């Protein structure tokens, strides 16, 4: 772990040894104390360094077959481009891409419009996360498209490192064939996931809803080891690309930061 901004994310089939129980009392004030980020819309005309940190020079563990590289992050054709490419970097033979917000965000509406990569062993992810590297419990809310089957997206959430809330939702036409809209509305007692404006998961059990403010991430990465989940990795011969047109966070009490926002239609 070479930087305090390192994600320290987990493989789905392994657990992080972490004593979260002693931090549980902090959850009640975590939203107010650490929600530094306010509402925003980013159409990625550029990568704003005050908003985004580009992961560079490390990997998240043995499950990941690539090294995060800032060279794989760019703006092109009106979108943020995250690439996975064959390039010897550190102890890995591939380079991959991730960005994360510099601030944390709490309850509210999170929206992104993007096109995923394709290929077995690849993961195109839009998610929020906080964890031990930030001296907090591991809380997380996920949209993940696995390149082995781009006709569906997996939604999931972690509360103090406990997951097991996975659900697969269809992405009509394929997540890699065009831009699709992914959103979640995160409230204290409810968490709703949407794909292209359609509700695909509604969580109302408070024990299955994260409480800690989190950073927003986009990432494209691969694996040689999690083949049961992500498929057997096979490099396609050319770089794979995830393209993000827009991301937005709308704080509670606000709405319609952009015309297509789900907050214009959902109470």
Predicted regions span which residues?
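Sec/Tat signal peptide C-region and signal peptidase I cleavage site
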Residues: 26-30
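GH16 jelly-roll
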Residues: 31-267
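Bacterial N-terminal signal peptides that target proteins for export
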Residues: 3-17
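Bacterial N-terminal signal peptides
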Residues: 16-25
């Amino acid at each position: 772990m070479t930087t305090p901004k390192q994600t320290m994310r987990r493989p789905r089939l392994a657990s992080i040894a972490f004593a979260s129980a002693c931090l549980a009392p902090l959850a009640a004030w975590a939203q107010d104390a650490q929600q530094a980020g306010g509402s925003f819309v980013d159409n990625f005309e550029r990568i704003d360094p005050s908003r985004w940190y580009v992961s560079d020079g490390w990997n998240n563990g043995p499950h990941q077959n690539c090294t995060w590289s800032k060279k794989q992050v760019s703006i092109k054709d009106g979108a943020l481009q995250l690439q996975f490419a064959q390039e010897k970097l550190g102890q890995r033979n591939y380079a991959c891409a991730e960005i994360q917000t510099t601030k944390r965000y709490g309850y509210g509406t999170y929206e992104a419009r993007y096109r995923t990569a394709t290929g077995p062993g690849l993961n195109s992810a839009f998610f929020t996360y906080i964890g031990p590297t930030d001296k907090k419990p591991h809380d997380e809310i996920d949209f993940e498209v696995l390149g082995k089957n781009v006709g569906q997206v997996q939604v999931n959430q972690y509360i103090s490192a406990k997951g097991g809330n996975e659900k697969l939702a269809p992405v009509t036409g394929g997540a890699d064939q065009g831009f699709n809209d992914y959103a979640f509305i995160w409230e204290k007692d409810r968490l709703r996931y949407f794909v292209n404006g359609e509700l695909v998961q509604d969580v109302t059990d408070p024990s299955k809803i994260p409480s800690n403010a989190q950073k927003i991430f986009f990432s494209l990465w691969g694996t040689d080891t999690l083949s049961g989940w992500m498929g057997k990795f096979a490099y396609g011969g050319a770089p794979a690309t995830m393209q993000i047109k827009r991301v937005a966070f709308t704080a509670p009490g606000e709405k319609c930061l952009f015309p297509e926002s789900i907050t214009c239609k959902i109470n």
